[in-house]
Amino acid sequence: MDVIKKKHWWQSDALKWSVLGLLGLLVGYLVVLMYAQGEYLFAITTLILSSAGLYIFANRKAYAWRYVYPGMAGMGLFVLFPLVCTIAIAFTNYSSTNQLTFERAQEVLLDRSWQAGKTYNFGLYPAGDEWQLALSDGETGKNYLSDAFKFGGEQKLQLKETTAQPEGERANLRVITQNRQALSDITAILPDGNKVMMSSLRQFSGTQPLYTLDGDGTLTNNQSGVKYRPNNQIGFYQSITADGNWGDEKLSPGYTVTTGWKNFTRVFTDEGIQKPFLAIFVWTVVFSLITVFLTVAVGMVLACLVQWEALRGKAVYRVLLILPYAVPSFISILIFKGLFNQSFGEINMMLSALFGVKPAWFSDPTTARTMLIIVNTWLGYPYMMILCMGLLKAIPDDLYEASAMDGAGLFQNFFKITLPLLIKPLTPLMIASFAFNFNNFVLIQLLTNGGPDRLGTTTPAGYTDLLVNYTYRIAFEGGGGQDFGLAAAIATLIFLLVGALAIVNLKATRMKFD
């Protein structure tokens, strides 16, 4: 007799389809909101990932994909999506001055106004639960008063000329400041038909739009008469001369346009960018190679020492040597920054007492780079030591016994047996370490902040900057504005360089991907 298993309420198909339906509606609502806000890339990504997830968890035939989907969705969202966005930005002029769309930039310019008429002093007087607006003309001495009104939204107030003083006490500056936004939405209409709006905390003035949009898309400055035309090569409204050529004046804010390969060509053709870029690239490669070599060398030697059978107290030494790995790196970096202080650091005090020298760790390029390598070796050797300690356990003791019978010494054992057997399994990890140090942003940012700075460069660059720090400084610390497009182009080049170097390393060591 077959036993029919009773399903719990949370296992019912009705509940499953109800939850999936609600999630589908929520996702659809979010996608529509993103699309309405102009965030097309986010909307498409959300739609693809959510639709795939709903299909996989609703379809029994796709049951096996339920174990793979979270990882693939995470990789797509946190790896591929930022990569695609970065590459897309690299082909635009996106920067602190060119962030808006053309339509939004045009709207901002058309919203600007200029003072084109008389200025009137104004006062705000209570009228029960409402207010009255009073204007006075300082030239003619005429006074104008509105009917009672309440704050809220855009409104037009018809003012009448009066000789009587409004009742009640005039509102102080605090009340006006609190209601400044509401007062800015008020248009006061004088008896002669002129319109005035709030221009300061105590004045209403006649205002007119600063720019007028012509039928051919040209903006005309109503104050100066200068005409501006959108220049899609640079992403700005730019003035035009009488003969139709481009003038020197540009209107901010600008708008985002596609510039093609311009940002990439700037890296290789602009000497102010090319020279620091190439120098920083060479230093980044050298820094990564030296760091990998020293961390592996120090870690391997220390692993061999703490695995030495004749050594007493090996457990204590292991714990002490692994401590730098247990302490968060940013804490160690800041501690070293204090130790290397040129005036009061303990390292310079010790060197001065012993040898009479005080290296300029933060102002001299060579010593600053040396300091970085020392600190990074300190931070990285425990990881390599732990790996080597585990790999040493896999080396058979018979090999060392056979070499001892042949009369091999300590160094021969290390270079002929230990090193060859360790270096092969360590190679993939060394490549990963190289890629990590190639983009070791935190070390540079916390210890030297890229300094000392290079002189004569178009973009901010330092002697200890890695490519990733150089990109960050261009994007967020540029003196001439934040150039996200150029930074994205350099980030794309970094991605290609790291990928190419990793492939070259794998090919050189003849490592098989499987």
Curated annotation (Swiss-Prot):
PROSITE patterns reported for this sequence: ABC_TM1
CDD domains per UniProt: TM_PBP2
Cytoplasmic side: 1-13, 59-70, 298-319, 393-416, 505-514
Transmembrane annotation, as ranges: 14-34, 38-58, 71-91, 277-297, 320-340, 372-392, 417-437, 484-504
Classification via InterPro entries: MalF_N, MalF_N_TM, MalF_P2, MalF_P2_sf, MetI-like, MetI-like_sf
Membrane topology, Periplasmic segments: 35-37, 92-276, 341-371, 438-483
Compartments, as annotated in UniProt: Cell inner membrane
Record-linked Gene3D superfamilies: D-maltodextrin-binding protein, MBP, MalF N-terminal region-like, MetI-like
Domain ABC transmembrane type-1: residue ranges: 281-505
Pfam families for the chain: BPD_transp_1, MalF_N_TM, MalF_P2
Topology of the protein relative to the lipid bilayer: Multi-pass membrane protein
Sorted UniProt keywords: Cell inner membrane, Cell membrane, Membrane, Sugar transport, Transmembrane, Transmembrane helix, Transport
GO MF annotations, alphabetized: ABC-type maltose transporter activity
GO biological process: maltodextrin transmembrane transport
Superkingdom of origin: Bacteria
Cellular compartments per GO CC: maltose transport complex
Broad class of the protein's primary localization: membrane
Reported function: Part of the ABC transporter complex MalEFGK involved in maltose/maltodextrin import. Probably responsible for the translocation of the substrate across the membrane.
Subunit structure: The complex is composed of two ATP-binding proteins (MalK), two transmembrane proteins (MalG and MalF) and a solute-binding protein (MalE).
NCBIfam families linked to this entry: PRK10999.1
Family per record: Belongs to the binding-protein-dependent transport system permease family. MalFG subfamily.
UniProt-recorded name of the protein: Maltose/maltodextrin transport system permease protein MalF
